[in-house]
Amino acid sequence: MTVHGIAYVEFHCEDASKYAAQLRDDYGFVIGEPAIPVRPGLTRLTARQGRIVLVLTSAAALDDPVSDFVRRHGDGAAVLAVLCEDGADAARQAEEAVRKGATPVEGTTVAGFGDLALRFVGRDDPLLAGPEPDPAALLQEIDHLAVCVPAGTLAPAVRYSEDALGFRVIFSEYLEIGTQAMNSQVVQSPCGGVTLTLLEPDTSREPGQIDRFLDANAGAGVQHLAYRTDDVATAVRTLAGRGVSFLTTPGTYYDALPGRLGDTEIPARVLRELNLLVDQDHGGQLFQIFTRSTHPRNTFFQELIERRGAGTFGSANIKALYEAVERERADSA
């Protein structure tokens, strides 16, 4: 599969206009109404920032597939659209994926994971029509999507990614936190522009956040969307000023940083002030933070990430991010 990156992520929503207003007010997205025909009773909006394009769709009819999705999962990511050269190339790549084992859905859309579908689209797709990306935007692009899958389905999901979609595994981790545990594998397209973190609970251990997501979401789905920024400290300060709430990290994490990593490219005092996490791989450092979920089911949330050379994910950050979500659950219980 020779895609060029993520074209857009489509969310199915109870109220697309309300969802768009939150993205505009809290995250600074620019909202537009694409000039494409939609079936009666369907509302479709776009939210743009940098190279990020989110498509927000809601339906008035209760028997519409969009409404069915929302009933099952609440508002959530329903389609990951990957960018091909043009419409003809999108059709060719969808056909190739089906030949290699992908399940066809409709047009150039194939099955993905649970109710998250994968759609091949060309650069000429009407949903992508709009101004050139602003290189100075606070949030630049979608770094990755994290997808929770039921126990026992991670290995088949990875095989599907490799065989039908041509992705490769770039990172694997079995994470134990107290009495809980999860498996994770990160798969990436050959171009490096589409990255999925696949998460599976270990049901031989006590239930944790992946189990709770799967229960509340009624199955597999996108747990979070990570936005890459060139200045995560400024992004956190800016979004916090707009009302976005972030998860916190205990001071002991920062006390241990000098022994674990030595000097960090963002000073430790700034990391501590903003609750930013830091890790590194062979290429450099990365900085991450999760937002507090505002989803009625407490499922979907968002992430900010800045990469300073790091191309994968650090084990310490994965553990710290997991623990941050667990603390939030305990505090809100």
Where are the predicted features?
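Short, structured patches in soluble enzyme cores that scaffold and shape functional sites
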Residues: G122, A146-A151, F171, E200
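N-terminal beta-strand motif that seeds the catalytic metal site of vicinal oxygen chelate
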Residues: M1-K18, A77-V82, P126-V158, A218-L225, ...
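Short beta->alpha transition motifs characteristic of CBS
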Residues: T57-A59, F120-P126, E200-D202, I305-G309
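C-terminal functional regions that serve as terminal interaction/effector modules
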Residues: C13, H224-L247, Y253-A333
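Internal, well-ordered alpha/beta segment that forms a basic, Gly-enriched binding/recognition surface
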Residues: G107-A136
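Short, structured motif recognition centered on aromatic/hydrophobic residues
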Residues: I6-C13, L23, F29, A47, ...
